[in-house]
């Protein structure tokens, strides 16, 4: 094998490696959750050892740089996370964006839960007149509501209530600090007339 051919193989190998790293980074970014190394290997159609090696190279490339993210590898799963020293700024962003990131359905559902808690999904659906599964899922994911028990009836449906995060996000000291529903309804009807 001549020297030019060896150099070409090396260039191709580096190019393939960089392509894999790019794909892995995209997958980690879009997932937002830990991804099993085995799943990454399946997606990339390569061996788990190769994925582990690529991940370690990527992890090392983030260390010591002025980057806001790092790769976290734990129990054969990997996740792209923000660096702890930036957490104060990330929290500020999340607090300002929470209201913007909630759909109308999620805001309606959250209002019902805040005023009627603890409440079941079926009761929420009856008040809204439509299914609320997706809105409830979104609110649970954002840790704005929580499961706070089960109703003691056949089927034992889950009861939902607000969390401490709900209070923080809306700047409330306690759940009692939310405006009285009757007062809001009176104010709303005055504005319409």
UniProtKB/Swiss-Prot annotation:
Q: Which NCBIfam families match?
A: SMC-Scp complex subunit ScpB
- Write down the species: Clostridium botulinum (strain Kyoto / Type A2)
Q: Which domain of life does the protein's organism represent? A: Bacteria
* Keywords, ordered alphabetically: Cell cycle, Cell division, Chromosome partition, Cytoplasm
- Principal localization reads cytoplasm
Name of the molecule in the record? Segregation and condensation protein B
Keyword Nucleotide-binding included in the entry's annotation: no
Q: How does it assemble?
A: Homodimer. Homodimerization may be required to stabilize the binding of ScpA to the Smc head domains. Component of a cohesin-like complex composed of ScpA, ScpB and the Smc homodimer, in which ScpA and ScpB bind to the head domain of Smc. The presence of the three proteins is required for the association of the complex with DNA.
**Cited InterPro entries:** ScpB_csome_segregation (IPR005234), WH-like_DNA-bd_sf (IPR036388), WH_DNA-bd_sf (IPR036390)
Subcellular localization:
Cytoplasm
Q: Which PANTHER family does its entry note? A: SEGREGATION AND CONDENSATION PROTEIN B
Family classification: Belongs to the ScpB family.
UniProt-listed SUPFAM superfamilies: Winged helix' DNA-binding domain
* Signal sequence interval, chain numbering: none
Give the GO terms filed under biological process for this record.
cell division; chromosome separation; DNA replication
Q: Name one Pfam family in it.
A: SMC_ScpB
Record's Gene Ontology CC terms? Answer: cytoplasm
Please describe what this protein does: Participates in chromosomal partition during cell division. May act via the formation of a condensin-like complex containing Smc and ScpA that pull DNA away from mid-cell into both cell halves.
